[in-house]
Amino acid sequence: MADTTGRIPLWIIGTVTGITVIGLIGIFFYGSYSGLGSSL
C-alpha cells in the first residue's frame, strides 16, 4: 500500500463515496416512487 500517513486511505474514500452515491440514488428513486420527487 502507498503511504497513507496524514491522509485518509483511498479504499475508505471509495467505500464512503460509493455508499453515499447509492444512498442518494436510492432516496431519489424512493422519492420519485412516492411522488415526493415528482416536482423536481
From Swiss-Prot:
Compartments reported by the entry: Plastid, Chloroplast thylakoid membrane
Gene Ontology CC entries for this record: chloroplast thylakoid membrane; photosystem II; photosystem II reaction center
GO BP terms in the entry: photosynthesis
Main location: plastid
Keywords: Chloroplast, Membrane, Photosynthesis, Photosystem II, Plastid, Reaction center, Thylakoid, Transmembrane, Transmembrane helix
Signal peptide: none
UniProt xrefs under InterPro entries: PSII_PsbJ, PSII_PsbJ_sf
Domain of life: Eukaryota
Transmembrane regions: 8-28
Keyword Transmembrane helix set for record: yes
Topology in the lipid bilayer: Single-pass membrane protein
Subunit structure: PSII is composed of 1 copy each of membrane proteins PsbA, PsbB, PsbC, PsbD, PsbE, PsbF, PsbH, PsbI, PsbJ, PsbK, PsbL, PsbM, PsbT, PsbX, PsbY, PsbZ, Psb30/Ycf12, at least 3 peripheral proteins of the oxygen-evolving complex and a large number of cofactors. It forms dimeric complexes.
Family: Belongs to the PsbJ family.
Described function: One of the components of the core complex of photosystem II (PSII). PSII is a light-driven water:plastoquinone oxidoreductase that uses light energy to abstract electrons from H(2)O, generating O(2) and a proton gradient subsequently used for ATP formation. It consists of a core antenna complex that captures photons, and an electron transfer chain that converts photonic excitation into a charge separation.
Protein name according to UniProt: Photosystem II reaction center protein J
Gene field: psbJ
